[in-house]
Amino acid sequence: MNNLGRILFLVLAVVTAIWLNYEEGTTSAPSRQSIASGASQDYLLAVSWQPAFCEQRPNKAECRSQRAGRFDTSHFSLHGLWPQPRNETYCNVSSETVATDKSGRWSRLPKLDLSVGLRNELERKMPGYRSYLHRHEWFKHGTCMPGFSPERYFRVSLDLLDQLNASAVRELAAGNVNTNLGFRDVSHAYGRAFGNDAQTRFILDCYRDDGRRIVHELKLSISGDLGETTDLATLISAGDVVGKSCPGGIVDPVGLQ
């Protein structure tokens, strides 16, 4: 073999080795699947103040049945757990299912395999379950958490919600119904509950209703491997600093105001 032939042979061998390594995932950047299965990820945990939600949508099934004393009138309710960035949605979901979801026909989405105990807990802590919110949240967001089944996705979400509801943040909201709650008040309670860094890792959402500004939702910035820990303080401390919140508003009581 002449020198040119030897050079071509060596080049071909190197290229083949690189290609094989790439196929086996030993070179280049790891795939999204491998990132999600072991390394940290960023999320937003969205929780609602349900009376405020029902102020806007009183005809929803979960709002027609809302009564004083029900869990969601004095505790935050689960909206969803959203992998970030925000365009991380509908992973490996059929175009037909995506179209059904985007049209708002959530009752026509495929049923989820959930245990009886979990369904009962969701009905209590995620009132939108009555309007099939759980199906929407799974197909839009939960499918982008590789290795998570619907059961595990909602178990983790409810675990995080329970920790928030056991904190000074929930006590502050429940203790100030029908009064104005400022952003600083919420921020201080959030810091007491989860550490000073937490004060820059949540968004307070509000909306206008006949001249009133109403506290509607909290979005918690968290980061970590949810397969390893669901300790909310730990996840919040690793979360991204988030953007501007509303300056505060009324904590809405049950019923139309």
Question: Residue spans of the language-model regions?
Answer:
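C-terminal, well-folded lobe of enzymatic/effector domains
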Residues: 2, 26-29, 118-257
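Hydrophobic membrane-insertion alpha-helices, especially the h-region
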Residues: 6-21
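Catalytic cores of phosphodiester-bond-cleaving enzymes
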Residues: 26-176
